[in-house]
C-alpha cells in the first residue's frame, strides 16, 4: 500500500475458552490514545453480537478522529438482531448465525490455522489431534 499509515493491533475477546456465545468484551493490552484528528479504519474478523466492535468504536470515537470506518471479513445474519447495533462500512461475506472456525478464527485456541472457514462441528473435541 503506497500510503503512509500507522498500523495498531488491539486484542478484544468475548468468547473465553470453549464458549460459543459472547460473554462480554475483554480488552487485552490497550487502546491507542493518539487518534484525535486521524483517519481510522477498524478491521475485524467477524461481526456477531456487536458488543466488541461497539465498545471499540465508542472508545475510538471519544478521541474525535477525523473519520472512523469499520470493515469486517464476516457478518453474521441475526434474525433477532444484535445485542448492539454497529454500522459497518465494508463487509466481506454475510454468513448464517453459526459458530465458525478456521482462517484465524479459533475454538479454545484450536483450528485457527485451518485454510478455510467452516462451521464448528457438533462435537469439536473429537477432531482435536
Ranges and model annotations:
Residues 1-129:
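PRPP-associated nucleotide enzymes
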Amino acid at each position: 500500500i503506497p500510503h503512509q499509515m500507522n498500523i495498531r493491533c488491539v486484542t478484544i475477546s468475548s468468547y473465553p475458552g470453549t464458549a460459543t456465545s459472547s460473554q462480554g468484551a475483554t480488552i487485552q493490552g490497550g487502546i491507542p490514545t493518539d487518534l484525535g484528528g486521524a483517519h481510522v479504519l477498524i478491521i475485524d474478523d467477524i461481526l456477531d453480537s456487536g458488543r466488541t466492535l461497539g465498545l471499540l468504536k465508542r472508545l475510538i470515537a471519544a478521541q474525535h478522529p477525523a473519520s472512523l470506518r469499520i470493515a469486517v471479513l464476516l457478518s453474521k445474519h441475526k434474525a433477532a438482531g444484535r445485542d448492539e447495533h454497529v454500522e459497518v462500512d465494508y463487509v466481506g461475506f454475510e454468513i448464517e448465525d453459526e459458530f465458525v472456525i478456521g482462517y484465524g478464527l479459533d475454538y479454545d485456541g484450536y483450528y485457527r490455522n485451518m485454510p478455510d472457514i467452516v462451521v464448528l462441528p457438533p462435537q469439536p473435541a473429537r477432531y482435536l489431534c
